Amino acid sequence: MTDSVSVVIPALNEERTVAHVVRACLADEPLEVIVIDADSSDETAAEAQAAGARVLNWREILPEDPRPGKGESLWRGVVAAEGDIVVFIDADLESAAPGMVSALTEPFIDPHIQMVKARYQRSFQGKPTGGGRVTELTAKPLVRQFFPELAHIDQPLGGEYALRRAAAMELPFVEGYGVEAGLLLDVAKR
């Protein structure tokens, strides 16, 4: 793949896990790994920087004050990113591992691909499934009902995914934690 890759890690008080996530992402040698710190009150920024990330406070990126929520961190990360592909990874992903960024970007060899969502197993009621309680009982049934073409998506709410930066610049990023589902639906409608 010849597209350049930026990794954006939104973070708020994730000092315990952010360095691990940064190191896992850097192992795949992206153009850059950016941690967007949403005014953490702990050592998140210092831990991320020590691990090799470029750390930006979300207030530094745009002149307007940030609106509260994860979507704002993600949007500001897109604005700050320089890569053709933007990979989003949650700062608290304890299972982050080398190869994760490459796996999310490989499908972009197809120029028609606009978004790639991670797929991983989480148990629910003692059975391996694609997601936790909210995903299995709410998100996936709603997606199957109203967007059957997306029924194959195991993690519609997951925070690990990649977008072409050009497409991301045209999408609305909602403020709260529904941002992942919103982006998925918006990309599907394009």
Which residues make up each language-model segment?
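Cell-envelope/extracellular polymer assembly enzymes that use nucleotide-activated donors
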Residues: 4-6, 32, 182, 187
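Short aromatic/hydrophobic "clamp" motif used to bind/position activated sugar donors
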Residues: 86
